[in-house]
């Protein structure tokens, strides 16, 4: 993931479902097609939630990883 150009980063640490998804949806809206949004969350359920969100919205889930207590998701705007 370090070699990707992230266009916007969103810190949702400390927020529980559905807030990380809602904030990501709001952040993605003004972004251009192909731009990348990195979301950092501490909600373990976000791993499942972001996979479902990407499938429902047509945005691509480029990567997910866990670093310590953080769950990092990278979405590509459709």
Would you name each region that the model predicts?
Residues 1-4:
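Short, compositionally biased "basic patch" segments
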Residues 6-13:
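Short amphipathic
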Residues 72-78:
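Core SAM-dependent methyltransferase catalytic element
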């Amino acid at each position: 993931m370090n070699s990707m150009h992230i266009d916007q980063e969103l810190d949702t640490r400390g927020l529980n479902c559905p807030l990380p998804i809602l904030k990501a949806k709001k952040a993605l809206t003004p972004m251009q097609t192909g731009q990348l949004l990195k979301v950092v969350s501490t909600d373990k359920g976000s791993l499942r939630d972001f996979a479902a969100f990407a499938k429902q919205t047509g945005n691509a889930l480029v990567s997910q990883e866990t670093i310590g207590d953080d769950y990092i998701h990278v979405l590509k705007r459709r």
